[in-house]
């Protein structure tokens, strides 16, 4: 049973195995079929993709799209495969449960793994093949692109070749035109030379002789024409014989020669006709002129009864008005004075000699009177004949120094008949002499002047300095607007919207109170609320959206309607309140309404600012809006390259942002050809109070006087003192004043701290502040002077704090790069003077430190206003010491007006200073806005003269009795018999001392009485420049002492007289050159200039004194740089001084006419 059971069991196992094998074979077959199907479908899809790629080979995006689709399909297949694998695993597990053979399961697993590996390998190979195909496709595309580029390059080269060919053709045509034009000009020149020769010949002969000359000239011209034709015929025959081997070429050249021959013959005929007509016209004019001259002279001789009023001689030279043109293009008319000079320079027997030569037609040589008969008449050049006749004799006479001979009265103009005949040639000779002296053939540039009464010799030095050294305001000439017709322009562009017009007056007042607006004026427009209510263009509104300008600021809400209405305006607002945008937007609308600016036109809008940094700031703000509108803006300020500014101004610009000094330089350069102010209708003065305070009032006034009166003028500033407002209202027409907040108030968003600290503790406190604030943002430190700025900069570098420095002594490029680095976060710490207190708008400036207290209230407002701008918060710390107590009241005022707490120590310091002021111990500190610049008025001139006299008196110089301003103005006699007051006093003192010594040894019985002593004393007192000495009457026993005193005085007087007689007489003068430009000082102190002047005048010139910059005063016993002139005569010294003044004036005018490239500072970039 057990055997049978095992047998059955084995049979069952075999059946099971067979069934498993059948199942496996079926499964393998199914899998192979699926693989084949997958491969077929994969191949079909690959073929489809390739077809699609071939069709869309020009687009790389299609490839990417196909790749994305293929990737999605692969992912889907991968999911399906995983699902099938999971099912397979389930089935296998089920089979494993049902099957007892674990070996079969393992083999199945091994087969499945192999299948999976093969599938993955095939997949990788497939991916590799696809990558290769994609790479080949890309390479194919790149080759196609390269082919297209080559095709484009080939086409471009073809176009360039065609253009070069066209250029060659044009160049060839241009050369041909130039050759033709050159030939034409040569023909015209030859024709003009012939005409001139004919004119000169006709001038030398009379009426009858001119006809004979014309006939002979015509014969000669015909003969020359015939010879020229014969030569041309021979040339053409020779040319045709040389080219017989080419009949075609020969025929072409023959045709060309015939055409040329015809044209030349026609030209000769036309020329001959013109000459005939000209000769006939001249002949008629000669007859009319001679007849008119004869009648005039007869009438004059009869009226005056002169015996010399005879007929003019037949051979007299003639001058005809309208016939003096020549090849250089001189005007045709000749004045009567020139005609007279030509007649006067001719010898008296000129006409007779010519008649003899023409009748005989031969002569041995050309006579001095101008004969033409040296050779045959046809071979004489008329120009040579004229030179030999007229010019050479005069040159010989001039060289010999002989006066010209007297001329007949018949050759004189009617205006000269009242004078003697002997004076007329002398006057004409002097005119010719003047022309020859000014020529280039003179041996020296310094010829002995003939006129001793030259006003420049006696010119006062003060007048010379005023005439040569004009101020910038004086260089710009005034304009008479009544003589200029200006084009009308529109100023009112504002239309009030309904939302604003519906507001009641109470609502308007409430709205202004909310904005802290105060308005003064008549019919003031209501303030706006949004940008679209201004009436600006859509481009400007779009630009403001891009710049995130959401809502107008208080000054803008009121300034925009006022300025857009065409009213003049004064705007006073705190720092950082948007004043710049308040005048920029209306100016752009004003400019767009006017005709476009062309090259050579001046600007329409002119913006003036006091500092270069503020000019750059305004220019950058305007550029944000002007670029989209197509409006050009040019900054004009000193210290930068002027060439670029001039080129941009010449091309034309609508807006100029400038400093007043450089603008006047530009307007005066090249006589005003660079730009002008004729089209300026919108004038802006930003920080106007500072410009008036810095002394720009004369320049600003002169610029405003050159602008049309009906302009629109706008003034803006953060501070506006009353005295400056009075000056500003002179240039405004019924202005409207806008005031935001207080008149000069610090922004309330700024936290102000004032610390009373001595000088020694400030640096450590500054380092503490830097440690606290350096992480938060930028820091600006203000100091009082340039030296303090450099010293603090060095200390900060030593303390390992990277920082920048900025002050007016630096070069302009350094200043610009420093501000740029500070704004662009290159360095977050800047040490500056008050030059950065205005116009510097830096984002993220969190802290301002006044290391030195500002010297007036307005400067404090502007310094602190560099932070807390455009609604942001800021902080300002100010250091003050007891030595700066005079500035404490200004700080207390600033804190109280801006509602900030006042420290107790600061209040005590201010109160103590005011107590001293009331007691008269201290003097109150001013605002600094009284106008520190020059007034250029008579009062200031009188103050200057008084100070000069006081200084001269302090140094021991006494004024002359003639109320002269300067001792150097007069040429004085040196070392003569005069004795100065100081020397005379010293002589008296020495004489008295000698008398005292001699008194002891003198005998009592000296024969000198008191009366003699008084007489001698009186004579001594009468000496010029000697102080009178009172000599007391001496008793009889002191007669010896008195005699000794008189003897000593006589000895001193005799010695001085002997010394004066021994010294040669000479004169001296002084010329101060300290205040002239550097190149002028160098020129007049160089030996190349002083040597010729000394040789010419005989005066010795030496340089004395020391150069002192502007503002520095020489110390006691020192003098500014001057020239000391000594000479043997007063005339030589005067001439030397006049020549030095002339050199100084020339160099100074050159320096002022050429615009400076920029003021060189103390520092420059190496």
From Swiss-Prot:
Residues 1-12, 21-45, 111-206, 224-314, 344-357, 416-426 have a biased composition (Basic and acidic residues). Keywords: ATP-binding, Coiled coil, Helicase, Hydrolase, Nucleotide-binding, Nucleus, Phosphoprotein, RNA-binding. PROSITE patterns: DEAD_ATP_HELICASE (PS00039), HELICASE_ATP_BIND_1 (PS51192), HELICASE_CTER (PS51194), Q_MOTIF (PS51195). GO terms for cellular component: nucleus. This is DEAD-box ATP-dependent RNA helicase 42. A motif (DEAD box) lies at residues 686-689. Residues 1-460 are annotated as: Disordered. A motif (Q motif) lies at residues 529-557. Residues 80-95 have a biased composition (Basic residues). Induction: Up-regulated by cold. The lineage of its organism: Eukaryota, Viridiplantae, Streptophyta, Embryophyta, Tracheophyta. Residues 560-738 form the Helicase ATP-binding domain.
């Amino acid at each position: 049973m057990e055997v049978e059971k095992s047998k059955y069991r084995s049979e069952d196992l075999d059946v099971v195995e067979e069934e498993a094998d059948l199942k496996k074979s079926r499964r393998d077959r199914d899998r192979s079929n699926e693989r084949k199907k997958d491969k077929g479908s994969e191949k079909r899809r690959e073929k489809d993709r390739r077809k699609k790629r071939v069709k869309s080979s020009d687009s790389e995006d299609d490839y990417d799209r196909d790749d994305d689709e293929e990737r999605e399909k692969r992912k889907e297949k991968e999911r399906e495969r995983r699902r099938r694998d999971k099912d397979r695993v389930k089935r296998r597990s089920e089979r494993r449960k049902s099957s007892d053979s674990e070996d079969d399961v393992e083999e199945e697993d091994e087969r499945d793994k192999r299948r999976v590996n093969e599938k993955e390998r095939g997949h990788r190979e497939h991916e590799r093949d696809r990558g290769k195909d994609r790479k080949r496709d890309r390479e194919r595309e790149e080759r196609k692109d390269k082919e297209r580029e080559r095709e484009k390059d080939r086409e471009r080269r073809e176009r360039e070749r065609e253009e070069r060919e066209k250029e060659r053709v044009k160049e060839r045509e241009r050369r041909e035109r130039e050759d033709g034009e050159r030939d034409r000009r040569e023909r015209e020149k030859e024709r003009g030379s012939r005409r001139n020769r004919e004119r000169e010949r006709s001038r030398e002969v009379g009426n009858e002789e001119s006809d004979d000359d014309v006939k002979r000239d015509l014969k000669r011209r015909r003969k020359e024409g015939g010879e020229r034709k014969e030569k041309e015929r021979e040339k053409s025959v020779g040319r045709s014989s040389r080219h017989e081997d080419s009949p075609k070429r020969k025929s072409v050249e023959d045709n060309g020669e015939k055409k040329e021959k015809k044209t030349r013959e026609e030209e000769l005929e036309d020329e001959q006709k013109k000459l005939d007509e000209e000769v006939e016209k001249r002949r008629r004019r000669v007859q009319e002129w001679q007849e008119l001259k004869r009648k005039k002279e007869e009438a004059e001789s009869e009226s005056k009864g002169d015996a010399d009023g005879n007929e003019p001689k037949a051979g007299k030279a003639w001058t005809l008005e309208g016939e003096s043109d020549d090849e250089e293009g001189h005007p045709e008319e000749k004045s009567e004075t020139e005609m007279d000079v030509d007649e006067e320079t001719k010898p008296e027997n000129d006409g007779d000699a010519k008649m003899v030569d023409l009748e005989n037609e031969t002569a041995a040589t050309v006579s001095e009177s101008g004969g033409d008969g040296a050779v045959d008449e046809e071979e004489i050049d008329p120009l040579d004949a004229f030179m030999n006749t007229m010019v050479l004799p005069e040159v010989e006479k001039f060289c010999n120094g002989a006066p010209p001979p007297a001329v007949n009265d018949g050759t004189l103009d009617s205006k000269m008949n009242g004078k003697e005949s002997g004076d007329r040639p002398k006057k004409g000779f002097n005119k010719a002499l003047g022309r020859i002296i000014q020529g280039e053939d003179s041996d020296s540039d310094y010829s002995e002047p003939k006129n001793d009464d030259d006003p420049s010799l006696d010119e006062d030095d003060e007048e010379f300095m005023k005439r040569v050294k004009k101020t910038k305001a004086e260089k710009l000439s005034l304009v008479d607007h009544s003589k200029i017709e200006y084009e009308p322009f529109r100023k009112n562009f504002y239309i009030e919207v309904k939302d604003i017009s519906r507001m009641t007056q109470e609502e308007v007042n409430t709205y202004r109170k909310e904005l802290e607006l105060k308005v003064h004026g008549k019919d003031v427009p209501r303030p706006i609320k949004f940008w679209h209510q201004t009436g600006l263009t859509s481009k400007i509104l779009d630009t403001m959206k891009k710049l995130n300008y959401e809502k107008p600021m208080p000054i803008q809400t009121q300034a925009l309607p006022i300025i857009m209405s065409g009213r003049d305006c004064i705007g006073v607002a705190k720092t950082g309140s948007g004043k710049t945008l308040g005048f920029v937007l209306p100016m752009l609308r004003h400019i767009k309404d006017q005709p476009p600016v062309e090259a050579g036109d001046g600007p329409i809008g002119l913006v003036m600012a006091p500092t270069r940094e503020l000019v750059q700031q305004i220019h950058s703000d305007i550029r944000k809006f002007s670029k989209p509108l197509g409006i050009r803006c040019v900054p004009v300020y000193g210290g930068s390259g002027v060439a670029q500014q001039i080129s941009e101004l010449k091309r034309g610009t609508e807006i100029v942002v400038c400093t007043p000094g450089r603008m006047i330089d530009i307007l005066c350069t090249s006589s005003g050809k660079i730009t002008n102010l004729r089209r300026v209708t919108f004038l802006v003065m930003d920080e106007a109070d500072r410009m008036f305070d810095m002394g720009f009032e004369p320049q600003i006034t002169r610029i405003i006087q050159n602008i049309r009166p009906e302009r629109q003028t706008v003034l803006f500033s953060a501070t506006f003192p009353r005295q400056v407002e009075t000056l500003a209202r002179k240039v405004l027409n019924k202005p409207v004043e806008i005031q935001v907040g207080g008149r000069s108030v610090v922004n309330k968003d700024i936290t102000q701290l004032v610390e009373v600290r001595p000088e020694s503790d400030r640096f450590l406190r500054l380092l503490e502040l830097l440690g606290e604030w350096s992480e938060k943002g930028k820091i600006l430190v203000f100091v009082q002077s340039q030296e303090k700025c450099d010293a603090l900069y060095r200390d900060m570098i030593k303390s390992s704090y990277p920082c920048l420095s900025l002050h007016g002594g630096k070069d302009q490029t350094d200043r610009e790069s420093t501000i740029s680095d500070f704004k662009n976060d290159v360095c977050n710490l800047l040490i500056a003077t008050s030059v950065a207190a205005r116009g510097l708008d830096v984002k993220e400036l969190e802290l301002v430190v006044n290391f030195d207290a500002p010297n007036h209230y307005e400067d404090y407002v502007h310094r602190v206003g560099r932070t807390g701008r455009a609604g942001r918060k800021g902080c300002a710390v100010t250091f003050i010491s007891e030595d700066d107590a005079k500035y404490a009241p200004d700080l207390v005022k600033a804190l109280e007006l801006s509602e900030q707490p006042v420290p107790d120590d600061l209040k005590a310091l201010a109160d103590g200073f005011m107590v001293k002021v009331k007691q008269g111990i201290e003097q109150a500190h001013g605002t600094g806005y009284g106008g520190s610049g020059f007034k250029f008025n008579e009062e200031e001139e009188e103050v200057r003269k008084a100070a000069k006299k006081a200084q001269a008196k302090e140094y021991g110089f006494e004024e002359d009795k003639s109320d002269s301003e300067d001792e150097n103005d007069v040429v004085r006699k040196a070392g003569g018999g005069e004795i100065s007051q100081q020397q005379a006093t010293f002589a008296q003192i020495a004489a008295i001392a000698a008398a005292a010594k001699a008194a002891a040894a003198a005998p009592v019985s000296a024969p000198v009485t008191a009366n003699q002593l008084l007489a001698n004393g009186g004579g001594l007192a009468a000496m010029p420049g000697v102080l009178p000495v009172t000599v007391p009457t001496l008793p009889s026993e002191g007669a010896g002492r008195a005699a000794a005193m008189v003897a000593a005085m006589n000895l001193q007087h005799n010695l001085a007289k002997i010394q004066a007689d021994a010294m040669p007489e000479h004169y001296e003068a002084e010329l101060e050159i300290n205040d002239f430009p550097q190149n002028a000082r160098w020129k007049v102190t160089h030996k190349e200039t002083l040597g010729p002047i000394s040789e010419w005048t005989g005066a010795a010139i030496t340089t004395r004194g020391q150069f002192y910059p502007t503002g520095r005063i020489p110390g006691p016993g020192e003098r500014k740089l001057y020239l000391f002139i000594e000479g043997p005569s007063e005339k030589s010294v005067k001439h030397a001084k006049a020549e030095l003044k002339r050199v100084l004036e020339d160099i100074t005018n050159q320096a002022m006419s050429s615009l400076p490239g920029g003021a060189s500072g103390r520092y420059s970039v190496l």
